Amino acid sequence: MYEKVFKRIFDFILALVLLVLFSPVILITALLLKITQGSVIFTQNRPGLDEKIFKIYKFKTMSDERDEKGELLSDELRLKAFGKIVRSLSLDELLQLFNVLKGDMSFVGPRPLLVEYLPLYNKEQKLRHKVRPGITGWAQVNGRNAISWQKKFELDVYYVKNISFLLDLKIMFLTALKVLKRSGVSKEGHVTTEKFNGKN
């Protein structure tokens, strides 16, 4: 009952409340990103519930700087000072409140990954798409980018099989603690984690 009905109601109400409460933060962050790097919003297609494709929203924290060959510079070079602050405080995820409001996402669930990963999942890993993807999830509070893809997917599937209101509350509480401690954002020495290749 919780997964099918109350979780969506809870998501909608909480997203609405948080959008109102955080609207000043969202506006100030957008303004400062506009001033410091020009572009504000990053959008990308991601697979959601039952692998249905939706457009995810994030604050854009990296510039589009390229080398003399026209290739994008490394993530480390494109992530500027204010972008680092936005990421360290997880402010880049705030725009996903709109995804939750629309019903594309939930507050808690497996993170929505790249569309190109879909054919790489095995049968068990595909179960992560049996629920709405989340802003945070069981994998994010148990290692995030510091653990292997295989371990992340194991944690995602555990969540799908054990979803409950109490588990969601626990994950949100642990997420808040991690944001305050600014922990688990990326592996040491990397801005983003390596891509999934079906074996890692």
UniProtKB/Swiss-Prot annotation:
**Pathway terms, separated by semicolons:** Protein modification; protein glycosylation
UniProt keyword Membrane, yes or no: yes
Where does it mainly reside? membrane
**InterPro entries referenced in this protein's UniProt entry, alphabetically:** Bact_transf
Q: Where are the bilayer-spanning segments?
A: 12-32
Other noteworthy facts = N-linked protein glycosylation in C.jejuni consists in the transfer of a heptasaccharide (GalNAc-alpha1,4-GalNAc-alpha1,4-(Glcbeta1,3)-GalNAc-alpha1,4-GalNAc-alpha1,4-GalNAc-alpha1,3-bacillosamine) from a membrane-anchored undecaprenylpyrophosphate (Und-PP)-linked donor to the Asn side chain of proteins at the Asn-X-Ser/Thr motif.
Naturally occurring in which organism (per UniProt)? Campylobacter jejuni subsp. jejuni serotype O:2 (strain ATCC 700819 / NCTC 11168)
Gene Ontology cellular component?
Answer: membrane
Q: Where in the cell is it found?
A: Membrane
* Protein name, UniProt field: Undecaprenyl phosphate N,N'-diacetylbacillosamine 1-phosphate transferase
Q: Which GO terms describe its molecular function?
A: glycosyltransferase activity; N,N'-diacetylbacilliosaminyl-1-phosphate transferase activity; phosphotransferase activity, for other substituted phosphate groups
Q: State the source organism's domain of life.
A: Bacteria
The residue range of the signal peptide is none
Q: What is its EC number?
A: 2.7.8.36
- Enzyme class at the top of the EC tree: transferase
